[in-house]
Regions:
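Non-catalytic helical/linker scaffolds that mediate oligomerization, partner binding
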Residues: 1-471
């Protein structure tokens, strides 16, 4: 039973009802909606289709909206495409002009104020490199260091530069408000660089009474440098290796990945490893050996989830990609000694009672060789706390709330279930244990460890452990 969660990006290759159904059957835990593309109406249609399917199939697939984020893009070129020659002069301007091989417009009008002579500007994920020679109020005069073809609306990156553009654009604000109304479980905040970025999003969520959890996407040196303060306020982080690999030296990406995963794991926060994990499966039915190793290594490092982007959004083999990723994850998990990792985890002196009870729950489950840890939770808080310790046995997290159950599907080792509301706590506890039995996780005579907060409904009040024998 796989513990690591799989996120699939929904796009032309995967948005049909038939393919969504197959992806859910294959093990998709979270469906990602990329707001860099598509209209609100298109996203709404796909979202409602997925929600209908997850209810019909009884699988609590979570939904994640991924913001466009603060970005800089080139405007249009004559003929749609030009060739930049190495060593040639090239000017970026804030004026609205049709682009040529000598001059092109940029979307961010304050870029000349932010860059300086000698700096580097990258275009199209770093394929084109420019060196800044001089700057005026409206123009940035550059030399082409690495040339190549450039076409309409390609992205622009400025490594090691603090940009003064606002974190939340008008488009992002409209998208977030739309996401609040529709009811996504998660939001991935693109290009997060500080804790304040996350707090700005929290204010919007609060104003719309949204319980969306926030995943901070780390895509720059600033984001890496501020990872501690970001983890303090975010619900999780994503190692977004695509833009991160453009903003920082390529050889540093694996180092940062391991560093971020470790910090998130210690704090009990969700951590997603993303970008090009099975990239060759965009066109091939099997991944490279290096890609298989990359996926496995992220799991050995302690990632909560692994993400497919183009592989499921527009690739030729979306279903095969999910099945392959699931097999790789299961093989890696089978090799990991989670019992030993739990035993060697540093003690948390001065922990709050919920943390202490969650830790003790995992200890009891390990000592009695329990088939499962079962928790009844109204908010998902208890499940998140237990998931932090990555116990050997599965965590069956039951809630009367469908959104909470779906939200818990991004937690490591958690099997979320929706149970009916009962008249009292004892009946809820029995319903949770029976849910584990009906799912085939535990059978008659097996021991399970039950934990919850009594009375139910008070977030952060986990205070009870009980051993149940399944009857």
């Amino acid at each position: 039973m796989r513990k690591t969660k799989i996120i699939c990006t929904i796009g032309p290759a995967s948005e049909s009802e038939e393919m969504l159904r197959q992806l859910i059957d294959a093990g998709m835990n979270v469906a990602r909606f990329n707001f860099s593309h598509g209209t609100h109406e298109e996203h709404k249609e796909k979202f409602k289709r997925l929600v209908r399917l997850r209810r019909e199939m009884g699988v609590p697939v979570a939904t994640l909206m991924d913001t466009k984020g603060p970005e800089i893009r080139l405007r249009d070129f004559e003929g749609g495409r030009v060739m930049l020659e190495k060593g040639s002069d090239f000017t970026l301007t804030t004026e609205e002009v049709m682009g040529t091989a000598e001059r092109a417009s940029i979307s961010y009008k304050d870029l000349p104020k932010d860059v300086s002579e000698g700096g580097m500007i990258l275009i199209d994920d770093g394929l084109i490199e420019l060196r800044v020679n001089s700057v005026t109020e409206t123009e940035i005069h550059c030399t082409v260091v690495n040339g190549g073809p450039v076409s309409n609306h390609k992205g622009v990156n400025v490594p090691d530069t603090d940009l003064s553009m606002p974190f939340i654009s008008e488009q992002d604000r409209a998208d977030i408000e739309f996401g609040c109304k529709l009811g996504y479980e998660y939001i991935a905040a693109s290009f997060t660089t500080t804790a304040d970025d996350i707090l700005q999003i929290r204010e919007i969520l609060k104003a719309h009474n949204s319980r969306m959890k926030i995943i901070a996407k780390i895509e720059s040196t600033q984001g890496v440098n501020n990872i501690g303060e970001i983890l303090d306020v975010a619900d999780g982080v994503m190692v977004a290796r695509g833009d991160l690999g453009v903003e920082v030296p390529l050889e540093e990406v694996p180092v940062y990945q391991k560093h971020i995963i470790h910090l998130a794991e210690v704090r009990g926060k969700i951590v997603v490893t993303a970008t090009q994990m099975l990239d060759s499966m965009m066109h091939n039915p099997r991944p490279t050996r290096a890609e298989a190793t990359d996926v496995a290594n992220a799991i050995y490092d302690g990632t909560t989830a692994i993400m497919l982007s183009g592989e499921t959004a527009s690739g030729a083999y979306p279903l095969e990609a999910v099945k392959t990723m699931s097999r790789i994850a299961e093989a890696a998990e089978h090799d990991i000694n989670y019992r030993s990792r739990f035993k060697n985890r540093p003690s948390e002196f001065g922990a709050d009672s919920t943390t202490a009870i969650s830790h003790s729950t995992c200890m009891v489950a390990q000592d009695i060789n329990a088939k499962a840890i079962v928790t009844v939770t109204m908010s998902g808080f208890t499940a998140r706390r237990i998931s932090k310790y990555k116990p050997t046995c599965p965590i069956v997290a039951c809630s009367v709330s469908e959104p909470v159950a779906c939200q818990m599907n991004l937690l490591f080792g958690v099997i979320p279930m929706t149970i009916p509301q009962e008249d009292n706590e004892e009946m809820l506890f029995e319903a949770a244990v029976m849910a584990a039995k009906q799912a085939g996780i535990a059978v008659k005579g097996d021991k399970v460890v039950l934990t919850a907060g009594v009375p139910l409904g008070e977030t952060g009040n986990t205070n009870m452990i009980r051993v149940f024998e399944v009857f």
